Amino acid sequence: MASRTMIDTDIAGNTVIVGLGKTGLSCARFLAQRGESFVVVDTRQSPPALAELLTIAPDVDCYLGGLEPFVFEQADRIIVSPGISVKESVIAKARFNGAEVIGDIMLFAHYADAPIVAITGSNGKSTVTTMLAEMARQAGLYIEAGGNLGTPVLDLLSLPQVTKPDMAVDGNKPEKPAYYIVELSSFQLETTARLNAFAAVVLNISADHMDRYNDLQEYRAAKRNIYNGCEVLVVNRDDPDVMEMLQECLATDFDVNGSIKNGSVISFGLSQPEDDAFGLRNSNGRQYLAKGEQCLMPADEMRLPGRHNLANALAALALGDAMQLPLDAMLSALRTYPGLPHRTQWVATINGVNWYNDSKGTNVGATVSAIIGMPGPKVLIAGGDGKGADFAPLREAIIANNVHLVILIGKDAPVIKETLFGVVQVELTRSLEAAVTLAYSLSSDGDSVILSPACASFDMFNDYEHRGDVFVNAVMSLQP
C-alpha cells in the first residue's frame, strides 16, 4: 500500500477508484474479481473500508489524505464514488484530457445480466424501490434490489447465485434475477451517461443538494440521465419538471442519445387517470387507486399513511405494470407493505397526540409532502443543515395545512425562523430531546407531532437514522 508520502509513479492499470467508502469498496471488489488492476485514492487518511480493501486486494496502491494530481494525470478511467463531486479540479482536468469519468452505476449497467428497473426522485425513492421489490416477490419472482438504498449495485452482481427449484429450468441450475430493482441518487446519475434501463421513473423534483449543484436545473439534469436508453419511461404527470424531462426525451434523436428508442410512456399522478395511466378515482363515496377507468383497490386499504404515499403506490403500480407483474400480487403488497423506518413512521399516541418520525425528510419537498399528507392540526419539528435550500415552499405548506406550531433545531434554525416569520408560532431549542419535551407541553388532544426536518442531519447527528432514533427514544420516554 502506498500513501501520499510513498508515491509509486507507475500507476497500475490506469484505473483510479476515487473514494473508499461502501461504494468504492464495491468497485474494488468487482474489479478484483475480474482480475483488473486499479489504484485507490481518498481524501481521508483512514477511510472506513481500508482494512477490508486490503483483504480483497492486498497489493493495491492507495493514495490517502488528498487527491494527488499525478495519479489522475495518468488515468484512463476514473470511477468516482457518489460523495465525490466530478467538479473536483483534478477530476475535471483528467476528463478534459480524455479520461473516462464514470461511477459504479455505469459499470453495473454494462455488466448487468438481467433487466434494470431504476427509481430516482427527490423524495420517495426508497419507499417505491422496496414497495416494488415486495410486489415482485409476492409475484414469485427472484429479484435483487439495492443501489442508493442498501446493497451497492456491483455487489448485486457479485452475490452468490441462488438455486430456486420452482423457477430454474431443471431444478438445479442457478437462477439469474428476473430484474434488478435499483434506487439511484442524483450523485450516482451524474456519472451515468446511459443506463439502458428496461423501465425507469423520476418520482418528483424539488430543490435538494443545492450545496453541490449550481442551481435546480443542474440537479434536474442529473436526474434526467435515468431515462437515457430507457425502454419504458414512467413519469409523474403532476410534476412540471418531470413532464419537461419527458418532452426533452421525446424530442431527442434516439439513435444518438437513446432516450426512448421505440419505448413507451406510462404516467401516474393523483388526478383521475386516462387510458392506461395510473391515478385516483372516486366511486360510491370512496377513493380508489385506479388504472384508466378501472378501480383497483380502495386507497384507505393501504397500510402507509399520507397522500404522498398514494403517489408512491401509483408509481410502483406503473413500474409493476411495465414488468407485467400480476395485479393481485401488486395489490396484496400494497395492503401489507409496512413502510420503512424514519419515513412518516407512526411512533406512539400519548394523551391523544400522535407522534410521527419522518427523519428521512431531509429536504424541503419531503417535509412539504409530509405536512400535506397528514390530516388534522399539526406540530412540526424541523431544522438541521439546510444545504443551501430555499425554505419558502415550507412557509406556504404551513399556512395551508393547519400547522399551528413549529419547533426548530440545528444549524439553519434561524434561517427557517426568518422564513416563517408572521405565519406560525416558532420556537427554537438546543436539542431534539428538548424539542420533543416542548412539543409535548404545547400539543393538544387530536394533534399530530411530526419530526420532518427539511434538512440534513450531519450538524447534530451521525445520519438521519441516528436523528430518528433519538426522536423515537425521546417520545417513548414520555410514556407514563
Short names for language-model regions:
Residues 1-103, 107, 305:
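N-terminal leader/targeting and accessory segments in enzymes
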Residues 42, 64-66, 103-107, 146, ...:
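Beta-strand->loop->alpha-helix junctions that form or flank phosphate-binding loops
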Residues 13, 30-32, 69-73, 82-237, ...:
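Phosphate-binding loop of NTP-binding sites
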